[in-house]
Amino acid sequence: MTLFNSISSISNSTGISKHSLIGNFESNNSRSGGNSISWLGGFDGCGGCGGCGGCGGCGCGSSNLNIINVDIDIGRRRRRRCC
């Protein structure tokens, strides 16, 4: 119920319909094993990707994840050089 209330407040501020948000969440939940990151990627303007956020074939959700991975790798390399 909390998720539905948060969807309602987000949709009211952005003008996106609640029905489309819930539909995207359900399709991503079944295709990506419940990965909420791919669902939230729709708020970055990539709503057309639907369920491909975590599969690497779509530019919207996977590009953000690649940037996060690069940041983690850089952080690990710096720690190894210092120690």
From Swiss-Prot:
Belongs to the UPF0512 family. It comes from the Eukaryota. This is UPF0512 protein G.
